Every structure is written in C-alpha cells, then in structure tokens.
UniProtKB/Swiss-Prot annotation:
GO terms for molecular function: asparaginyl-tRNA synthase (glutamine-hydrolyzing) activity; ATP binding; glutaminyl-tRNA synthase (glutamine-hydrolyzing) activity. This is Aspartyl/glutamyl-tRNA(Asn/Gln) amidotransferase subunit C. Keywords: ATP-binding, Ligase, Nucleotide-binding, Protein biosynthesis. Gene3D superfamilies: Glu-tRNAGln amidotransferase C subunit, N-terminal domain. It is an enzyme of class 6 (ligase). It catalyses: L-glutamyl-tRNA(Gln) + L-glutamine + ATP + H2O = L-glutaminyl-tRNA(Gln) + L-glutamate + ADP + phosphate + H(+); L-aspartyl-tRNA(Asn) + L-glutamine + ATP + H2O = L-asparaginyl-tRNA(Asn) + L-glutamate + ADP + phosphate + 2 H(+). GO terms for biological process: glutaminyl-tRNAGln biosynthesis via transamidation; regulation of translational fidelity; translation. It comes from the Bacteria. Allows the formation of correctly charged Asn-tRNA(Asn) or Gln-tRNA(Gln) through the transamidation of misacylated Asp-tRNA(Asn) or Glu-tRNA(Gln) in organisms which lack either or both of asparaginyl-tRNA or glutaminyl-tRNA synthetases. The reaction takes place in the presence of glutamine and ATP through an activated phospho-Asp-tRNA(Asn) or phospho-Glu-tRNA(Gln). Heterotrimer of A, B and C subunits. Its EC number is 6.3.5.-. Belongs to the GatC family. The gene is gatC.
Length: 99
C-alpha cells in the first residue's frame, strides 16, 4: 500500500468512527498500520501445510449452569443515569447515514 492510500484509509476509518485526528496521529496510525500489514505478510510466509488446525484449545470440561430467570431493573432505573433520555428511551448521537 502506498503511504497516500494508508492515510486515506486512516482518515476514512476515523470519520466512520466519529474521531477527529490530528495530522501527527494520522501519520502515527498510518505507520502502525504499515507495521501490522508487514507482520501479516510474515505470517503468510510460514509453512503450515503439515500442521493440523486447532478446533478447541480449551481442554478442561465445560460446566454449564442452570438457566434460572431472575428479576430485572425497571425502565426508569435503566435510564435514570443516562445523559439524555426521551420517552423512556436513551438519546444518543446519530452515527449512521452521515456520509
């Protein structure tokens, strides 16, 4: 990837994440992104053709608990500490459809 594409990708991800990044941060994340891709390339070079896949790494027995219904909090209790609420619902900033 070229440096320009990496910067554009970082800027796009920041916008989608609703983050405002400084130019130094974009450069830092771009370099980190480059390092991550380099590491992935190294992993792709590893010969694993004779290695069996791991399906489950946890060997110990799994214990399941009985599913017992319990009480829950009321709607009023749930929203009492919310920064904003309207009509019994949480009010949050819009994050979808802003492009």
């Amino acid at each position: 990837m070229t440096n320009q594409i990496e910067k554009e990708l970082i800027e796009k991800v920041a916008k989608l994440s609703n983050l405002k990044l400084k130019e130094e941060e974009i450069e830092l994340f771009s370099n980190q992104f480059k390092d991550i891709l380099s590491f992935i390339d190294k992993l792709n070079e590893v010969d694993v053709k004779d290695t069996l896949p791991f399906y489950e790494l946890q060997i110990e027995e799994k214990s399941e608990r009985e599913d017992i219904p319990t009480g829950s909090i009321t709607n009023e209790e749930a929203i009492k500490n919310a920064p904003q609420a309207k009509g019994g619902f949480f009010v949050v900033p819009r994050v979808v459809g802003e492009e």
